[in-house]
């Protein structure tokens, strides 16, 4: 009996040491790029109204016409109902949108990535977008079909950001030493970040197709690892009051949480007035959001926004 107990304890100890070793190797692999650059995490805020009013009317008109966002939607055949919902709703406000599918789908037009691996799909979609549209768009927004995005608010947030700088924006999450932008809230890359990412896609030592790890990590973490090698780091996007504008939950869930945690300040405790994304929506909720954001109007009440972003010609502005 004593011998069996001793063998059991040895097995537990060896197992614990092995797990610890694996964990250390994982952190070394993910954090490898941190030795190349020192970076303090930033919280980037949207401009306030006073900043916009300082811009001349002619400049505002030029900005509203020239500011262009290319949208990338990663979809799978099982997402066909969500695919239909985003196609009928908010993606009409992108200056250009392409759907990248894991396989050929007859129901909707898409670009076939011929893989079900989300990281490979993301890599291929970014390469396609850069190769084809690098001279036409300065900002690239990637999202899931469960995400609802308000593109006008995204453009407003990016208004004073220079796309020739390496921006990598959204809702940031920390995992060990790695900070990354969660795909749940959508990911924004500037053209400079796209250039740097594209230069690394063919270098497996820095941006491997399979992550090069003992276990597989999510596609948004893999993207952050690759970008880190290029000196591009995750930035959390916030409004002028410090509230997150890229959200990984639905409006309904935020309101439910606010009613529990801040019963006397439900609206203030919920979400930013300039929110860009919400996630985890059903197809019906997509259409409800579209109604609330673009269609519902209070008669006689006029919004005097300093800047107007119009959707591309031929799209339904709702």
Swiss-Prot record:
It is a single-pass type II membrane protein. The chain crosses the membrane at residues 7-26. It is found in: Membrane. GO terms for cellular component: membrane. Signal peptide: none annotated. Residues 27-318 are lumenal. InterPro entries: C1GALT1/C1GALT1_chp1. One of its GO terms (biological process) is protein O-linked glycosylation. Keywords: Chaperone, Membrane, Signal-anchor, Transmembrane, Transmembrane helix. GO terms for molecular function: glycoprotein-N-acetylgalactosamine 3-beta-galactosyltransferase activity. Residues 1-6 are cytoplasmic. Its main location: membrane. Probable chaperone required for the generation of 1 O-glycan Gal-beta1-3GalNAc-alpha1-Ser/Thr (T antigen), which is a precursor for many extended O-glycans in glycoproteins. Probably acts as a specific molecular chaperone assisting the folding/stability of core 1 beta-3-galactosyltransferase (C1GALT1). Associates with core 1 beta-3-galactosyltransferase (C1GALT1), probably not with the soluble active form. Belongs to the glycosyltransferase 31 family. Beta3-Gal-T subfamily. This is C1GALT1-specific chaperone 1. It comes from Bos taurus. The gene is C1GALT1C1.
């Amino acid at each position: 009996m004593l011998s069996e107990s001793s063998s059991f304890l040895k097995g537990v100890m060896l197992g614990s040491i092995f797990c610890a070793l694996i964990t250390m190797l994982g952190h070394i692999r993910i954090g490898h790029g941190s030795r190349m650059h020192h970076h303090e995490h930033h919280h980037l805020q949207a401009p306030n109204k006073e900043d916009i009013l300082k811009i001349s009317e002619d400049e505002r008109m030029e900005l509203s016409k020239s500011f262009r966002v290319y949208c990338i939607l990663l979809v799978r055949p099982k997402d066909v109902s969500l695919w239909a919902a985003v196609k009928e709703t908010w993606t009409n406000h992108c200056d250009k949108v392409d759907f990248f599918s894991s396989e050929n789908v007859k129901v909707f037009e898409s670009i076939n990535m011929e893989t079900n691996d989300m990281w490979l799909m993301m890599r291929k979609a970014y390469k396609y977008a850069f190769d084809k549209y690098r001279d036409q768009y300065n900002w690239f927004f990637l999202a899931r079909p469960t995400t609802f995005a308000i593109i006008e608010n995204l453009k407003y947030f990016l208004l004073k950001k220079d796309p020739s700088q390496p921006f990598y924006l959204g809702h940031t999450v920390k995992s060990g030493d790695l900070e990354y932008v969660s795909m749940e809230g959508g990911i924004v890359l500037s053209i400079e970040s796209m250039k740097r990412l594209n230069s690394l896609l063919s270098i497996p030592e820095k941006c491997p197709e399979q992550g090069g790890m003992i276990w597989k990590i999510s596609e948004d973490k893999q993207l952050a690892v690759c970008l880190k090698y290029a000196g591009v780091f995750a930035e959390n996007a916030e409004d002028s009051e410090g509230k997150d504008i890229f959200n990984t939950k639905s409006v309904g869930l935020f309101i439910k949480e606010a009613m529990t945690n801040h019963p006397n300040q439900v609206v203030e405790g919920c979400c930013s007035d300039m929110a860009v994304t919400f996630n985890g929506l059903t197809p019906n909720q997509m259409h409800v959001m579209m109604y609330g954001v673009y269609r519902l109007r209070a008669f006689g009440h006029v919004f005097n926004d300093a800047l107007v972003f119009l959707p591309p010609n031929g799209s339904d502005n709702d």
